[in-house]
Structure formats: C-alpha cells, structure tokens
Amino acid sequence: MAHVFGIDIGGTGIKGAPVDLENGKLLAERVKLDTPQPATPEAVAATVAELTTGFGWTGPAGITFPGVVVNGVVMTAANVDEHWIGTDARELFSKATGLSVEVINDADAAGLAEMKYGVGAGENGTVLMLTLGTGIGSALFIDGILVPNTEFGHIEIHGKDAEKRAAESAREGEGLTWGKWAGRVDHYLEHMERLLSPQLIIIGGGISRKSDKFLPLLTGLRARVVAATLQNDAGIVGAAMVAPSA
C-alpha cells in the first residue's frame, strides 16, 4: 500500500499526515495538535483519534512514541505520563482510532525515513542518527538494518544523561552560545564514536535546520557528520513506513 497515515507523538505536540511511500512525501499539509497535559494514555489516544478522524482516514497508520516500544508495548516513557509504562500502545491506539496500527520509537522512525528517503539513502556500514531536541533520540543502523530502541541519549557523561548536556533544550535552557553548545555536542559524539565507530552520523530534529551554526564547529571526529534532510517530517514518514501492510 503506497498511501498510509503517519503520526508523530512528541512531548508538546502530536502531528500527522498521509504519506506517499513511493517517495516519502506528505500527501497533505500536516496537522499538529497539542499534546494533552497530563499526557496519559487515554488522553493521547483521544488526540490521535482526533487527528485521523480529521483527515477522514480509514486505512492503516503508523505511530511514533517517545520511549522504548517492544511488540507494541511501551517499556519507558520520556516527556509523557509514567502510566504509559507497560501499556499496550498498539492495542490502545487501534481501539481509539478503529484503524490497524503499528507503534515504533520516535527516533527509530525518523532514522528509518532518513535512511530510505534522506541523506542516509544507500549508506552501508554503521550509521548513527541522533535527534537533538527536548532530549536526544538515537537510531542505529548496521548495513541498513535498524537496531531498535538504543536510547543513546541516556548514556552518562560527566555524571548526567548526555541529553541533559547536549540536547537543544540544554542550549536554550542554559543560554549557551553556539560554540559552547557545539563543544558539548562534539564531546558526546566523540563518546559515541568510541563506542560504535560509525562511518556516518546524521543530526536530526528541528535543530537540523540550523546545522550551519554548529556542524562546522565540530572537530576531531573520524565519521562524517551531516544534517538530516527530512527535518521535522521524518517522524511522520518513518511512522508511515511501519504501518501494517505498508
């Protein structure tokens, strides 16, 4: 099926659109709704249903989630209510929308999209995609195959989760200059390079639109470091890629 619906759940917004899997393009302008607060399973499911209903969608859908997802079940929850842990999200969203759905980690979805339709297309070997936003999401690929749920943003550096130091939210929250923040990102990437030896590191998330501000400041890395090209549509497109029968 070439046309499917993708939904990207974030800590502040839930966005969705139909996607053409032939080319990875959105078939309509995406719609973004506020993530309910508190972001309980029931409240988020209702918002997801509002999105699909608004488009009159009756086909399959893929949905991202900001946490570890194993066989449709949420194992960790970042930036959403802790009651998600242990929830069968696939069943919950299917009942709420009346659709056939699949659920995937948000960074993994963005990585899948970037590896098929974006800057990672055709890349073999070890590729690491990192989304720098509220936190740090990660997607690891070995010869094009996803290693799911890596959660490398939670690796400890200087006694803190890496995302507390190197996410975009740290730059904004601490008022860091681009140079100061780039130094933190550089240190984090050096750490990841020692662990994984990737040939390519892709930087995604909204910050990828400002890559000229910090990518030239990264030094000492063997890997190529490039900005993602799908930017904020990557999650929607990647979600659509894992939709049932997609």
Where are these regions (language model features)?
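ATP-binding/phosphotransfer module of carbohydrate and carboxylate kinases, centering on a glycine-rich
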Residues: 1-61, 69-73, 91-99, 113-129, ...
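Conserved NAD(P)H cofactor-binding loop of Rossmann-fold oxidoreductase domains
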Residues: 66
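A charged helix-plus-loop insertion that forms the helical arch/lid used to bind
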Residues: 74-86
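General beta-strand structural signal in soluble alpha/beta enzymes
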Residues: 101-106
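Extracytoplasmic strand-loop-helix segments at the start of, or within, the mature domains
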Residues: 136
